[in-house]
């Protein structure tokens, strides 16, 4: 595994060969719900305009691109690790496991895997970690968008079930509103009990 920081266009060209998969995660920081990952193999002959780091896109733009990715990509797969798994093996290991699940779920076996960040799990094939890759490589950008939309939808479903917690607004992140809801209503089965603010509310 190679880790790239400040990657050059030439380095990108050198590693972006064949049917490579981009991988990213969403949801390491929240106090509740799954950590969600996605793996995407784009079609170089059917490009998608406007891909970028999901955090830099509006919700409307993410939804639009999400639909285009589903239509145009060669393969898209979503992985996740549950709160119970996060509590058992910790958030870092759970994230790596969810990434492995996303790649394993692809309908096409990729030639290599490019992961946003500074580390990769063992995919059983060539892989590269690319710092800030979600803003540099379209396949990683696409994965970040898919993971973000999927996790946000999970939080909206949870918000419909437990409206008093405001999950549709803070998406489970440790905000003042979330802390206040924990203090007032207590924890839910979906909360990550290994995270300190949740433990303290138990």
UniProtKB/Swiss-Prot annotation:
It catalyses: Endonucleolytic cleavage to 5'-phosphomonoester. SUPFAM superfamilies: Ribonuclease H-like. Its cofactor is Mn(2+); Mg(2+). It is found in: Cytoplasm. GO terms for biological process: DNA replication, removal of RNA primer; mismatch repair. Gene3D superfamilies: Ribonuclease H-like superfamily/Ribonuclease H (3.30.420.10). Its main location: cytoplasm. One of its GO terms (molecular function) is RNA binding. It holds the Pfam family RNase_HII. InterPro entries: RNase_HII, RNase_HII/HIII, RNase_HII/HIII_dom, RNaseH-like_sf, RNaseH_sf. It comes from the Bacteria. Belongs to the RNase HII family. PANTHER family: RIBONUCLEASE H2 SUBUNIT A, RIBONUCLEASE HII. This is Ribonuclease HII. It comes from Shewanella piezotolerans (strain WP3 / JCM 13877).
């Amino acid at each position: 595994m190679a880790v790239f920081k400040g990657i050059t266009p030439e380095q990108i060209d050198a590693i972006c060969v064949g049917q490579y998969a981009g991988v990213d995660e969403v949801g390491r920081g929240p106090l509740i719900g799954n950590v969600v990952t996605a793996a995407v193999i784009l079609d170089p002959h059917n490009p998608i305009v406007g891909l970028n780091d999901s955090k830099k896109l509006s919700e409307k733009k993410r939804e639009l691109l999400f639909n285009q990715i589903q239509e145009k990509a060669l393969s898209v797969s979503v992985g996740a690790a549950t709160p119970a798994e996060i509590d058992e093996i910790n958030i870092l290991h759970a994230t790596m496991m969810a990434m492995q699940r996303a790649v394993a779920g692809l309908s096409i076996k990729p030639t290599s895997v490019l992961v946003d960040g500074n580390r990769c799990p063992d995919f059983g094939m060539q892989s590269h970690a690319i710092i800030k890759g979600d803003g540099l490589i379209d396949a990683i950008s696409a994965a970040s968008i898919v993971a973000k939309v999927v996790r946000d939808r999970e939080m909206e479903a949870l918000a419909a079930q437990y409206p008093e917690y405001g999950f549709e607004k803070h998406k489970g992140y440790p905000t003042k509103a979330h802390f206040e809801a924990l203090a007032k209503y207590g924890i839910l089965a979906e909360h990550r009990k290994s995270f300190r603010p949740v433990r303290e509310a138990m």
